[in-house]
């Protein structure tokens, strides 16, 4: 099964905009939480995105996979780092996570191929 992860992220951005317009206070709070959770601290932002993509696999959230694969690429994650994160997701989620791990790697590869010089 092949999915177009960049297109999925773009389509979800349109849908999320509608939610943002309909629930501005909730979405402001969600954005503030996202900023607080992803900023560097004891763990850097890239490590946090690797954790996020592993969690996205474990909870089987396609949109989450798309957004966190894109963010991981932007933060300089390597394919090897994503693979190690997928190993942890598999360990924590067993068989169903294997299906999402394959999709998360596919999403990462698609976003990485879009980078200049790829």
Pin down the residues of each PLM region.
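Charge-rich, acidic-biased intrinsically disordered regions
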Residues: 76-86, 113-118
């Amino acid at each position: 099964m092949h999915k177009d992860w960049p297109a999925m992220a773009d389509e979800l951005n349109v849908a999320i905009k509608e939610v943002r317009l309909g629930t501005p206070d909730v979405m402001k709070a969600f954005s503030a939480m996202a900023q607080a959770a992803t900023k560097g601290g004891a763990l850097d932002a890239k490590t946090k995105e690797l954790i996020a993509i592993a969690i996205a696999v474990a909870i089987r959230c396609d949109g989450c996979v798309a957004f966190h694969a894109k963010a991981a690429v932007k933060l300089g994650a390597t394919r090897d780092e994503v693979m190690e994160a997928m190993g942890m997701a598999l360990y924590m989620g067993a068989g169903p996570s294997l299906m999402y791990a394959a999709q998360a790697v596919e999403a990462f590869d698609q976003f990485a191929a879009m980078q200049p010089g790829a």
